[in-house]
Amino acid sequence: MSKFQVVEHPLIQHKLSILRRKEASTKEFRELVDEIGMLMAYEVSRDLPLEDVEIETPVQKTTVKQIAGKKLAIVPILRAGIGMVDGILKLIPAARVGHIGMYRDEETLKPVEYLVKLPADIADRQIFLVDPMLATGGSAILAVDSLKKRNAKAENIKFVCLVAAPEGVKALQKAHPDIEIYTAALDEKLNEHGYIVPGLGDAGDRLFGTK
């Protein structure tokens, strides 16, 4: 399986088309990010291992398949990544949630890390690292660096976004060729300000109604 995947499910693509529209309200944008995050989680969790478990139905005992107890952590890159967390938790409510806080220096376009808060057993968990946008790749690279410094295993890290620029994908793959990348769309390019084109604007501002 390729370590880079565009998830082309019709429901995801339909909701993404509405999300991109500039007239989408903060409420609509927030709800759509939540919904697409949940749908992306369905695809990203496709390879979770299963085990046989014996249960009893109202009729008789039987053997069923359940996820094999693999621990999961959802780690949003703040602040926009928070918008994807609740949707994933709807599917996987037992997951732990960590946080990696970053902001982008608007002059250098480089990320600055200000917070890392992770489950103590992060080394033993499969990790969904989430951020709606993969633009230059700087924030994602720094976030994966932070996870690896805290003993997270590369094979357990999956970066999940809604929209990616080719430049960001290339940069993240170069820095961390050992992690998987999932996106709902691979867009055309970055503009001179480091924003994805056509993109969907500033995801954080649109999620939280700020400027």
UniProtKB/Swiss-Prot annotation:
GO biological process, one term: UMP salvage
CDD domains in the cross-refs: PRTases_typeI
The enzyme's E.C. designation: 2.4.2.9
Keyword field contains NADP: no
Amino-acid positions noted as binding uracil in the UniProt annotation, renumbered to this chain: I196, G201, D202, A203
Residues that, per the record, bind 5-phospho-alpha-D-ribose 1-diphosphate: R79, R104, D131, P132, M133, L134, A135, T136, G137, G138, S139, D202
Coiled-coil boundaries: none
Entry keyword annotation includes Flavoprotein: no
Cofactors, names only: Mg(2+)
This protein's pathway: Pyrimidine metabolism; UMP biosynthesis via salvage pathway; UMP from uracil: step 1/1
Reactions the enzyme catalyzes: UMP + diphosphate = 5-phospho-alpha-D-ribose 1-diphosphate + uracil
Activity control: Allosterically activated by GTP.
Keyword line: Allosteric enzyme, Glycosyltransferase, GTP-binding, Magnesium, Nucleotide-binding, Transferase
Molecular-function annotations in GO: GTP binding; magnesium ion binding; uracil phosphoribosyltransferase activity
Highest taxon listed in the record's lineage: Bacteria
Cofactor mode of binding and number, as noted: Binds 1 Mg(2+) ion per subunit. The magnesium is bound as Mg-PRPP.
Task performed by this protein: Catalyzes the conversion of uracil and 5-phospho-alpha-D-ribose 1-diphosphate (PRPP) to UMP and diphosphate.
NCBIfam families: PRK00129.1, upp
Family indicated by similarity: Belongs to the UPRTase family.
Listed name of the protein: Uracil phosphoribosyltransferase
Organism: Lactococcus lactis subsp. lactis (strain IL1403) (Streptococcus lactis)
